[in-house]
């Protein structure tokens, strides 16, 4: 679904993604200011960003995937959310690719768009969604490839889906 239906009432305006605003939902991935640790004979700078992706619950292991996303049209209807209760999920654009992330706090499934928050990246930022954080599927502003790290393991797919009783839309 790309277009907003006549039933979408609540309009979320995607706010610029910041670490502070996104903290209840996970972690923002961005190149820090300043210099990292020199590696490769001084030809590269290394920045260690996050060392606990929380992917090992119930025997899980990291899975690196590539999502090739089409650009979405905005405003975009938000009527369905999903979560991964057993592990985090990471989205990193490969290149300068903006995307919108619509989220709700972990816990009970959201029932209304009023319970959601929306953020737009600057094209160079990624996010790590904390385990159990409700989120909309990837909403690429700019078409392109995204590296996705998520939990793989026994027990089937770690994905719960809910439909909002009161859907809404997100706009840039």
PLM features per residue range, with description:
Residues 120-134:
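Conserved metal-binding segment of the jelly-roll/cupin
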């Amino acid at each position: 679904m790309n277009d907003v239906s006549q039933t979408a009432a609540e309009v979320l305006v995607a706010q610029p993604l910041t670490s502070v605003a996104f903290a209840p939902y996970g972690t923002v991935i961005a190149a820090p200011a300043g210099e990292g640790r020199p590696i490769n004979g001084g030809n590269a700078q290394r920045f260690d960003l996050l060392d606990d992706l929380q992917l090992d619950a119930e025997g899980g292991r990291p899975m690196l995937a590539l999502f090739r996303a089409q650009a979405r049209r905005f405003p975009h209807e938000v009527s369905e959310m999903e979560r991964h209760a057993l592990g985090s999920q990471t989205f990193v654009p490969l290149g300068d690719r903006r995307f919108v992330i619509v989220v709700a706090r972990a816990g009970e499934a959201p029932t209304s768009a009023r319970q959601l928050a929306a953020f737009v990246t600057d094209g160079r930022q990624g996010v790590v969604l904390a385990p159990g954080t409700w989120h909309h599927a990837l909403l690429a502003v700019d078409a392109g490839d995204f590296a996705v790290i998520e939990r793989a393991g026994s027990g089937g797919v770690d994905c719960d889906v809910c439909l909002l009783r009161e859907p809404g839309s997100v706009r840039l």
